[in-house]
Amino acid sequence: MQNKGLIKLFAILFGLVSLYQLSFTFFGSKVEKDAANYASKMVPTNDAREKAIFERKYLDSVSNKQVVDLAVTNFTYNDIKDKEMNLGLDLKGGVNAILQVSVKEVLKGLSNDSKNETFNNALKAADLRLKSSNDTYLNLFFVEFEKLALETKLSDPTIFGTKSLRDKIKFDETNDVVKEILQQEINSSISTAFDVLRSRIDKFGVTQPNIQRIGNSGRIQIELPGAKDIERVTKLITSKAELQFWEVYSNAEVQNYFFSANEKVAELLKDNSTSDESEDTDKKNTLDDILGETSDSTKVVQKNLFTYLFPNVAQNQQELSSLVGQAKVLDTAQVNKLLRNKEVKDLLPSELKYVKFLWDYKPSKSSDGTELLALYAIKSNKKDKAPIEGDVILDASQEFSQLNKPEVSMTMNGYGSKLWEKMTTENAGRFVAVVLDDYVYTAPSVNQPITGGRTSISGGLMTVAEAEDIATVLKAGKLPATAKIIEIEVVGPSLGKEAIDASFLSFGLAILMVLLWMTLYYGKAGLYADIALAVNILFIFGILASFSAVLTLPGIAGIILTIGMSVDANVIIFERIKEGLFKKKGLKQSVEEGFSVKGALSAIIDANITTLLTGIILYIFGTGPIKGFALTLMIGIGTSLFTAVFITRLLIDSAVTKGSKLTFNTSISKGWFQNLNIEFLRKRKIAYIVSGAIILGGIISIASIGLKQGVDFKGGRSFTVRFDKAMNATQVAETLKGAFGSSPEVKTYGTDNQLKITTVYRIEDEGVSVDEEVQSTLYKGLKPYIGKTSYNDFKPGFEKAKNANGIMSYRKVDPTIADDIKTSALWAVFGSLLVVFLYILLRFRKVSFSIGAVIAVFHDVLIVLGVFSITYSFMPFDMEIGQSFIAAILTVVGYSLNDTVVIFDRIREFAGIHTKWKYSEVVDKALSSTLGRTINTSFTTLLVMSAIFLFGGASIKGFMFALIIGVAVGTYSSLFVATPIMYDTTKKEEKNN
């Protein structure tokens, strides 16, 4: 082996760099542990929110202080956080969201809210098409506009030929030119949204945030590992920062309308309860409009508006208030429906014609602990345009009022100052409201005109964090359009911590099993392979830390798979060396041949390249967990090759040079798989029948039963909910049917006191409050099982006690992005198959080899799908078909190809050496000679995967089950499917030659 010194130097330096990079993770966790201990001392109770505040204070206090001194250099806590290894949400907890900037809103803004019928009909048609299309909203709008336009052009003065765009869009400009301009404007708006969101996130206070644009889709991905206050995060990233100042009606001006509305609601409900359902459909529909999905006459106790809304009645001048009523937080959606009902709105007097009702931004607690939200009556107008808007704000900052309460101080420009002075002059003795994103933050009485352009937002319940966030969004600027969360994953820190513990336990056990097996099977050579394996693991984690890559649960699975591949490389080499020794060649010659291209190296490189190609395709087309898996897989392939080929070689060469006794077997493994001569091809028809029967059974199951699609493929919401006792999933599903209107999927998740609840309830509805309303519906539905747990404690976010009730993790996927995820996953599968087909064709120069490999892969995938279809209904773990499952399928593809390529490489070698043999004999002998390697590698890989499956977290069991089935089937198919099909598709004359 040449350049031993250089390889040693490189390995030592690489190892030291890896240790150096990983040290930051160690030091960072030590500081965070100190912060947690400090918080526990300051807050002796189990109040997770208070503890989080003190933790943050401690970390802020040491952020710029020296916490590590390495003599030659030192580091602050901020320095450490920048350099430590990033953990994904599934290991650390936090929020991962994909936001869709509303292109529709941007188009409406560019048209100055055009009332052109063709324009608005095209927007509506594009909305409908978007639900079932993977195309962009803008392209769909163009297609629909051209269908409806006839003679109308996009440059029409009533559409985009406006004053604001006249410098860019000329009169009678062609549609093609206008399309290009609109695309530029949309891109500019999305860039603005990206900059605004990045500015907000930078000031949020989490370490290692990540924000990136997703191609030209108008989507922005935000990752906030470790974020605990989920409600605060979602408000920060979805807030449009639309600040408005409005005049407000007093309670005295609205109360008579409320009394009339109350009577009307009572009348409608009474009519419904006394009418015959089959004859009075219209009235039933009216009730459905009012009560929505919860309408059930058996549940209504008091049949009027005031069942849900508590009016604030003014009987004299002293009782005048801007607060017109209150409602329980969980009843606000009901009040909204009632007040939006057409028959109720028809009762509005002329002076209240344009009134709009907005809620306070934060609930207050009544004397009995009930959370109540205040309702305000805003004096709107025909155009719904506020007298003063946020564009007049020059600066905003968090300060404290004279009463030492947190507030947001704002400074207006000259124009805004004049408008504010005018507004406060005209409304002396009345009320004005400061509204942010349709929530009222303050609605004080105006005592005198306010001059100078300074004002403040000072809600009585505002915290310092909330005031800081409001100042942040106001300074960062207004989003050009609504940013809707189309996919969000929330993992509570408790679940993340448990996932880390389970993952590293299973990881440690898996490694220990592999190390023991290699030593038991190969003796001293196995010990050298173990050392190389340990170096390989160090290199993988060192590279992840160096490049600030994110480690996730699927990423850990990727590392473990590469460990299996690293073992495979050593097994191939050792088996070749054993062959040389069996042929009475010297140890030195056998080692040299084993590590040569003509020996094991060719098969190792071919096998790893096919898996690498799969990893690249996964990384290009995959998202989320698939990307994390692909990244660790690709890194692991590189380090596995280096350690197996060079580190193991260095150790073995050193032993050979010193004349040490070197064994490649033990008393246990001696003689295994030697002198085998199995006639595989004679049994191929039996294999075809067995495989065909299994695949047919799977296809019948898929056609009749189907597969359980996860929310990332079909859209919906899934909640992982923990209870303080064991739960019956069927009973909970039946209970929730009443709350959601249809039966959700409920399954035990991990332990018997944890359930995964999946529902499509209100997934099509839009609006910033929908997610909150769905969570509140879930809370109400589960109330019989969670006792006195408050809604705030039930929601996801802060760390929960081991047996506390509440949402541990939450995921939502909009149906529009679900289609995109499914499409990209299918492209990943077919793309990897195509690339591998071409690579095998290039390497082996025969179509029959490619055909055999690809058919075997299809065989493996179909069997895994069939097993999932047949077993998902009764298996005690989650078996959803989603992104992680696709990652598992592609891993099966990679493993199966790896196995097949090693065998094909041996067939090619034997065909070149044994030219006098029949082709069938060549194939059988080649298969027999590689059987030891095939079984050994499969056994160690299955050993590793079984350890993870048994001891890993609940979130990875379905993933590992697919891999276990795939590896077992892949081993079988490489022997009994790929090779026989390759043989049967090889032309007769080629066999004879």
Please identify what each model-predicted range represents.
Residues M1-S18, F24-K81, M85, E105-F142, ...:
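Interfacial helix-loop-helix hairpins and adjacent transmembrane helices
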Residues Q2-K4, V408-S409, N413-A428, V432-A433, ...:
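Interfacial segments of transmembrane alpha-helices in multi-pass membrane proteins
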Residues S23-V31, P44-T45, I53-N74, D79-D437, ...:
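Non-transmembrane, solvent-exposed regions of membrane trafficking/translocation machinery
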Residues I12-G15, L527-S548, I559-S566, F629-A644, ...:
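Small-residue-enriched core segments of transmembrane alpha-helices in multipass membrane transport
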